[in-house]
Amino acid sequence: VLYANNLEFDNVPLGQMIHERTGLPVYVDNDANVAAWGEYCAGAGKGSSSMVMVTLGTGVGGGVVLNGKLLTGCNGAAAELGHFVIDMHGKECNCGMRGCFEQYGSVTALICQAREAMAAHKESKLWALAENEEANVNGKVILAAYDAGDETAVQVVNTYVHYLCVGVTSIINI
């Protein structure tokens, strides 16, 4: 693993380590690249010559297949879709830049936004659903509060969806 900023890995020979322990052949690649290739070969992208896949989780990832070839770049990080700027004065990203899509469009960002909103809105249903512990806030809690019509959760989800739209529209236009 050359670099994984969300895992704090830097030049870790993960494939070799797993191979040595299991004796099995191991191929390590970017998770979003592998997911995109799988969708291209056997899923939603099957039959297309080109496609883009966006993954949302701890961060924002992506994989791009162009004319039947997975774009990997010189170090396997050709489609780091979470690291283009959508707010140049925005939050600092762990990559060192400010306002990256990942800081607004990841599930981690959604949870952080909900926790910040909870601090200002003690009446929010988010508190009860999270058993009065910010640490218990996750996507399910946020969406349950949203479905229940909680104003704080509705505002958080609407803001999150706005940033998703900005980010995905930018990806489409690239």
Regions found by a protein language model. Give the residues of each.
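Short beta-strand-loop/turn "lid" adjacent to the catalytic site in phosphate-handling enzymes
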Residues: 1-11, 27
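Short, active-site-adjacent cap segments at secondary-structure transitions
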Residues: 34-36, 61
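Hydrophobic "anchor" residues
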Residues: 1, 70-71
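A cytosolic small-molecule/anion-sensing beta-strand core signal
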Residues: 66-67
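Short glycine-aspartate micro-motif
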Residues: 27, 50-55, 61-63, 94
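ATP-binding/phosphotransfer module of carbohydrate and carboxylate kinases, centering on a glycine-rich
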Residues: 15-24, 38-49, 70, 85-174
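Structural signature of FAD isoalloxazine-binding scaffolds in flavoprotein oxidoreductases
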Residues: 77-80
